[in-house]
Amino acid sequence: RGNQLKFFQEREPIPITENFPLIKFLGGSIKKGRLEIMLHGYDHQYKINPDLTRIPEFIWRSDLESRVRKGQTILKDALGVNVTSFVPPSNAIGQRGLKAITKARLNLLGVTGTRSLMRVNPVNLGYALTSRLNKSYPYNVREFVGHKQLMCRSLAPRSNWLRLLSDFEECRKKEGVFIVATHYWESKSKHDTEKRTITDLLLNLIEKANDSGATFVGVEEAFAKEKS
């Protein structure tokens, strides 16, 4: 899917089970403990409006519960893993999507508004208020009915690099959890304002974290690290 000219938004999604080299690479890396597998939507398909604006999959789709189940099954069959975390396509998730991952008991890489949480389960209001009292807020693990949430920052060519560094510094002072998401096909792309590659910026951020004494853990361990 990284070759956007050839594969981006194809009409028929191609299951990961048909990509044998990728399955082999991922399987070996999982055994070595080098990576974790998360569910990132089902096919990442956008709805294109007449004005050409794009609506992300977990906003516009109505069959999200079945899509989550099918996605979990595909990853289980392909890699032998039971995924526990969900990353919304385009970092966007609506109320239906939130209900779907809650039912599947998948933790969310991202945060949602209190109103959506309450519509899924009114008890979530109490959890949301409690989370705000955490010393690490907003960089703490937020626990709700059926799932947890962790804030996730994006590093892409158009990301605000100075804001990302500022957020990292705030997180460091609060001893919170800092997660950065990026795309492998953008690794060699230059940042719009910094004029350095995304790889260079990511390595710079990792170096800053290492120098500050940060502990590097996987997402699953981060979710288990604390309670809000």
Region locations from a protein language model:
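Catalytic alpha-helical scaffold of carbohydrate-active enzymes acting on polysaccharides/glycoconjugates
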Residues: 1-85, 91-142, 161-180, 191-228
